[in-house]
Amino acid sequence: MSRHLRAGRRRWWAEIENCAGIWADFDRVEWYEVGGSSYPCPAYEGRCEGWWQPPHTIYMAQDQTGNRQLAEHEMLHDLLQRGDHPPVFVACGVATQSAW
């Protein structure tokens, strides 16, 4: 991941932490880029643009790496350590239509 992208994600991490009221070390997350705009989703049938795998791995489609809402959505999964979508996803503005 480029230094510029990492710095941006670190800022987004701090903002989603503040919204959720949960704090954790950004550096615990391992980030992976998957080629294209989406990829076959390993967790369910269909395609993914982003996916969080416990405990601290986030996969994002290469064409989506700058998508703040998607990145923060996956970050929130990591902060919460859960794969479902409780109301905090809506409250923090990172609920995505495809996630429901």
Stretch-by-stretch model annotation:
Residues 72, 76-80:
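Short active-site segment of divalent metal-dependent hydrolases/proteases
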Residues 18, 69-70:
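Predominantly single-stranded RNA-binding modules in RNA-associated proteins
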Residues 55, 64-69, 81-100:
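Post-HEXXH active-site segment of zinc metalloproteases
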Residues 1-64:
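Auxiliary, metal-adjacent structural segments of Zn-dependent hydrolase domains
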